[in-house]
Amino acid sequence: MSDDKKAQYAFVHAAVWADDIKDPAHGYTKDDDTPTGQNIGYADKNMHRYWHFKDVRFSTDGTQFVDADPINAVSQIKLFVAALPTSSGASDDLRSYDMVWLLHLIGDIHQPLHATERMSAINPDGDRGGNEVNVMPATGETIDLHGYWDRMFGGYVSVPGAIFDANDKGGISKLQVDSVKAKILDPDVWTHESFVLGKKFAYEEPVLSENTVAVLTRTYETDARN
């Protein structure tokens, strides 16, 4: 493996660590009932599942709702970014921990269903970013809506596989970078963009009206991929 790919391996592997620790085998505590925005480094043994998203809520049937908890992906991105410069006085341990989380959360918040939650009579407490909504894509299996959109970004069983797809298949080289948007560093702006996309495309028909399993149309799946 070349030095460049070794460096990529480290970053790709680090970027999924925040999901890896959800596995009880890693010894981290599921703490969803006690949200906290603490930043103490690797001594923190909580999973912090609620750091992975910011639920911007909406309803299409008049269901009333309140804003979600203020501790979320955006609050943590801001906290971690502030600790990264050496001028922050934070320890190397803390800055390393924050970098690992940032690699993950910035990716999460660009997935529309990490920034969108529909409130409805069927799910008055919210659909948890599509986790409570079942859909059937053209492949024929039933999957939750959130998982369907997660797969839009690729799924790999190994870090080298992800790197191969990004490099050797021209994944990165084919990306067209919007130089104006690339200068937008405000996570609130990223989140709003994801919310707009989620509301428009993730919850379009047949998902919008179906209360059991939404059989996805070709139009829906084409819009999702694009």
Regions of interest found by a model, annotated:
Residues 1-105, 112, 117-226:
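N-terminal, motif-rich segments that launch catalysis or mediate targeting to/interaction with membranes
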